[in-house]
UniProtKB/Swiss-Prot annotation:
GO MF annotation terms: aliphatic amine dehydrogenase activity; methylamine dehydrogenase (amicyanin) activity
InterPro entries: Host-pathogen_enzymatic-act, MeN_DH_Hvc, Metamine_DH_Hvc, Quino_amine_DH_bsu, WD40/YVTN_repeat-like_dom_sf
Taxonomy, superkingdom: Bacteria
PANTHER family: DIHYDRO-HEME D1 DEHYDROGENASE, PROTEIN NIRF
UniProt protein name: Methylamine dehydrogenase heavy chain
Family: Belongs to the aromatic amine dehydrogenase heavy chain family.
Pfam families for this protein: Me-amine-dh_H
SUPFAM superfamilies reported for this sequence: YVTN repeat-like/Quinoprotein amine dehydrogenase
Function: Methylamine dehydrogenase carries out the oxidation of methylamine. Electrons are passed from methylamine dehydrogenase to amicyanin.
Gene that encodes it: mauB
Length: 400
């Protein structure tokens, strides 16, 4: 029951009167003209009708930078115009997200993991398809909570060569590859596989994986996720040839370039019919090996198809320091291994990528500087940068 209290009402009326008087006093003292210190900002008219301009369409110089944030629960993809070194947009992603670009550059796909209580609680895995120009979400597809959560490896998820499907790797409770139908915007099936890793798509609904014995095994699949394992290739590297976790692979050409911790370069050309292994070669001379030159970083290799040039991030370093940043890029012929040039980046770099146009950019990402540096890939000259890119960016992606 509410009791009427005249004293409380009188107090409330007095407080209201005091507040009104105070506001009137402030209004009387308010300036009637805009302070000159505000300049043009103070006289800019307000906009009643606001329109959103469309974003820039993707081109050969477009680059996407992934900031995994040192295993933070939320991550970011930065869309950057490599022509002018301008930030075009940002896409929020989940823990250890994978990013995949369509072959025509019109959309990109992210696979994500989030939790109901930020860093704990119920896990939720999903896939988003995002328009590359507007950055609008075109599809949000739920998938089983089985993404392999590890330091981001580009080939733990991939688009099919025709952009119709997305494939992602599951490690536990058993090895499998998940199939997502992007056209129907739906998850299809988890396909059981042997103990193999990394996904390298080829045409006609087929892909290869790298298996523990050092071979590549091919798998075909149909629209319902029925998997057809095929005969594995020969073992192409020895047990002591420790391969980096982020090789270069082109969905369009099937070219695979895979360096080891010591600088040996393995290569192959993958098709839906066969695999042609190329003769491996050494990146460093014997004198350079004695001086402790080794590849290092997180995304250490790139390849320019038309120029047939391999780019490897490297520095003088102690053994087993292969994930630490490097300052130099060695550029070699993709067939013979002949040294073409060495680029001093002038920064500690964690990952590199190269555009595929006639005048290519070399992109170099530094987690420490939180910056994408742009270089002329031929001359090695630094031409620009974009800084303040999150917590610890390590990976960049360009159109295939």
């Amino acid at each position: 029951m509410t009791t009427f209290q005249p004293g409380r009402l009188a107090g409330q009326l007095a407080a209201t009167a005091l507040l009104a008087a105070t506001c009137s006093a402030f209004a009387a003292d308010a300036p009637t003209t805009v302070p000159s210190s505000l300049g043009a900002i103070g006289t800019t008219p307000t906009l009643d009708n606001i329109t959103m301009e469309p974003g820039l369409p993707s081109d050969a110089k477009r680059v996407y930078v992934l900031d995994p944030g040192h295993f933070h629960v939320t991550t970011t993809v930065y869309t950057i115009d490599g022509n002018k070194n301008n930030l075009l947009g940002m896409t929020d992603t989940g823990k250890l997200a994978n990013v995949m670009l369509s072959s025509d550059g019109k959309f990109f796909v992210t696979s994500n993991t989030t939790y109901s209580r930020i860093a704990r609680g119920k896990r939720d895995d999903y896939v988003e398809v995002i328009d590359a120009q507007s950055h609008k979400v075109l599809a949000d597809i739920d998938i089983p909570e089985g993404r392999f959560l590890t330091g981001v490896m580009n080939r733990m998820a991939s688009l099919s060569t025709d952009n119709k499907y997305m494939l992602f790797q599951q490690f536990a409770p058993s090895p499998a590859v998940g199939l997502v139908d992007l056209e129907k915007k739906s998850f299809v099936k988890m396909m059981d596989i042997p103990d193999c890793y990394q996904i390298f798509p080829v045409p006609n609904q087929s892909f290869y994986m790298h298996c523990r014995d050092g071979s590549l095994q091919q798998f075909g699949y149909d629209d319902k996720g029925n998997l057809k394992p095929m005969k594995p290739t020969k073992v192409f590297h020895g047990e002591d040839d420790y391969l980096f976790v982020n090789p270069y692979y082109s969905n369009g050409s099937g070219r695979l370039v895979w360096p080891t911790y010591e600088g040996r370069i393995f290569q192959a050309k993958l098709t839906d019919k066969k695999v042609d292994f190329m003769k491996p070669f050494e990146l460093f001379t014997e004198a350079e090996k004695k001086a402790n030159w080794r590849p290092g970083g997180w995304q250490v290799v790139a390849y320019h198809k038309a120029r047939n040039e391999i780019y490897v991030l490297a520095d003088q370093r102690a053994k087993w320091t292969h994930v630490t940043a490097s300052r130099y890029v060695f550029v070699v012929d993709g067939t013979t291994g002949k040294r073409l040039r060495r680029i001093d980046l002038g920064h500690e770099i964690d990952g590199i990528s190269v555009t595929q146009d006639a005048n290519p950019n070399l992109y170099a990402v530094s987690a420490e500087a939180k910056t994408l540096f742009t270089f002329n890939a031929v001359t090695g000259k630094e031409t620009g940068k974009v800084d303040e890119l999150g917590r610890a960016p390590t990976i960049s992606l360009t159109m295939d």
